[in-house]
């Protein structure tokens, strides 16, 4: 696998040469600082761009063209990492060497037509297309409430700090989506093209010069950006733990505990605390939380701990019967305390092996390989070989030391089940 960067002035092309896959993947990555007021507009924009454009006037026209391009797939995704908003337009295509003709240029032209020839008239996006996307986004936002786990997590982060970027839904709210007009979306489109950093990743077995020439012919990005894009999002700590309970019609209660990670070194963020989380509850069925809550007390089916590195948060969530909520919280706190003194060499070895396996598996899929190089470029992620060697150096003493560097911020319960089970 050979990786190269090609500076094109207003954007960068990243080529990843490998013959492991029959497809070629092209991902156009737009990146900027999160703006809470614009998140809904951004998410909506990238969905609208792929509905139709001035050349392919309907969604059906788009799909028919993709079928002509050997069933190529074009899609977009918008997400948030810490304080950074990322939107990717992705083309997954069969390598032309397996096709009847070299259609690479046609496919790349199709990709950039979606970006640079949108369905805009008189500085306004097509209203019917916009309404279709808005209705879909609103439905997606509302369905979060139908997923108790996601709903509880979203609520818990808002309870922790409603103003924090960690609590922000990148799709926005129903109200903000409803406020999007054709002219406002056009303003967002101009804003993204003028101010987002652009990186184009290409992975597969291809002629490098041919790909670069084709992309440079259609990628008409012309603004050089110099501002800083910050990925780390700082959350406030709390002297007194905040507790809140809300009621729901769910069969079980959702329990969420949010901890701040405090004063971790860069190395601890990248390596030691990753292993801490794997031992605690982010790894296999051999974690401390799993043993404490499920094996020893048969409390739950769903249990997870998540380390949000770029938000300095550790989040623990579980689903239990309402009568067991207080016990579950007590046991989680006990497990956190055990991490200070009761970590074993065997637990470290299991966690490290899981991490190494995950790193190796990331190179089995083109999209995950692109993510690997993307985060090497926009964050402090080390290369895979370095990460594997550093994880092997983690000891139980190092993990027990970082266990001192967390503090409980918020306990949130989305209560379900019989309201008489627990007062």
Q: What is the predicted function of each stretch?
A:
Residues 14-41, 46, 190, 197, ...:
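His/Glu-based metal-binding/catalytic segments typifying zinc-dependent metallopeptidases
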Residues 63, 117-141, 227-237, 334-362:
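Acidic/histidine-enriched alpha-helical segments
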Residues 52-55, 96-100, 117-126:
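Short, polar/flexible loop-turn hinges at active-site or ligand-entry regions and domain interfaces
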Residues 182-218:
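Non-catalytic, conformational "gating/processing" segments within enzyme and secreted inhibitor domains
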Residues 78-81, 186-193, 305-308, 400-404:
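Short, flexible, solvent-exposed loop/turn segments with mixed acidic/basic and small polar residues
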Residues 14-16, 22-34, 40-42, 59-113, ...:
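M16 family metallopeptidases and their MPP-like homologs
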Residues 138-143, 240-252, 357-367:
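Short, low-order "capping/linker" segments at domain edges
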Residues 1-17, 207-245, 401-423:
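Proteolytic maturation boundary segments
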């Amino acid at each position: 696998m050979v990786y190269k960067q090609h500076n094109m002035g207003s954007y960068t092309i990243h080529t990843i040469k490998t013959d492991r896959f029959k497809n070629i993947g092209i991902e156009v990555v737009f990146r900027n600082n999160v703006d809470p007021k614009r998140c809904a507009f951004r998410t909506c924009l990238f969905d609208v761009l792929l509905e139709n454009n001035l050349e392919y006037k309907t969604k059906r026209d788009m799909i028919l063209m993709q079928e002509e391009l050997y069933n190529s797939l074009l899609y977009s995704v918008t997400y948030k990492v810490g304080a950074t908003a990322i939107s990717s337009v992705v083309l997954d295509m069969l390598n032309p060497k397996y096709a009847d003709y070299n259609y690479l240029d046609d496919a790349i032209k199709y990709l950039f037509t979606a970006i640079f020839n949108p369905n805009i008239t008189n500085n306004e996006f097509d209203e019917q297309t916009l309404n279709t996307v808005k209705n879909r986004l609103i439905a997606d936002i509302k369905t979060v409430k139908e997923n108790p786990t996601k709903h509880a997590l979203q609520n818990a982060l808002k309870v922790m700090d409603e103003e924090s970027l960690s609590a922000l839904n990148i799709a926005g709210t129903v109200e903000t989506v409803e406020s999007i007009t054709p002219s406002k979306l056009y303003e967002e489109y101009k804003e993204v093209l003028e101010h987002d950093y652009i990186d184009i990743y290409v992975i597969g077995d291809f002629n490098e010069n041919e790909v670069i020439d084709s992309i440079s012919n259609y990628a008409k990005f012309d603004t050089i950006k110099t501002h800083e894009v910050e990925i780390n999002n700082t959350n406030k700590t709390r002297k007194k733990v905040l507790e809140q309970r809300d009621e729901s019609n769910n069969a079980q209660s959702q329990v969420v505990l949010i901890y701040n990670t405090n004063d971790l070194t860069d190395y601890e963020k990248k390596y030691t605390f990753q292993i801490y989380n794997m031992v605690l509850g982010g790894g296999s069925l051999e974690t401390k939380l799993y043993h404490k809550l499920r094996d020893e007390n048969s409390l739950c089916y769903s249990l997870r701990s998540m380390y949000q590195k770029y938000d300095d948060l550790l989040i623990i969530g579980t689903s239990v019967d309402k009568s067991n909520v207080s016990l579950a919280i007590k046991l989680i706190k006990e497990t956190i305390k055990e991490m200070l003194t009761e970590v074993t060499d065997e637990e470290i070895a299991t966690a490290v092996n899981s991490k190494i396996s995950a790193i190796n598996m990331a190179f089995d899929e083109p999209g995950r390989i692109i993510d690997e190089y993307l985060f090497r470029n926009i964050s402090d992620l080390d290369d895979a070989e370095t990460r594997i060697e550093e994880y092997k150096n983690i000891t139980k003493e190092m993990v027990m030391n970082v266990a001192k560097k967390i503090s409980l911020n918020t306990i949130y319960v989305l209560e379900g089940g019989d309201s008489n089970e627990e007062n």
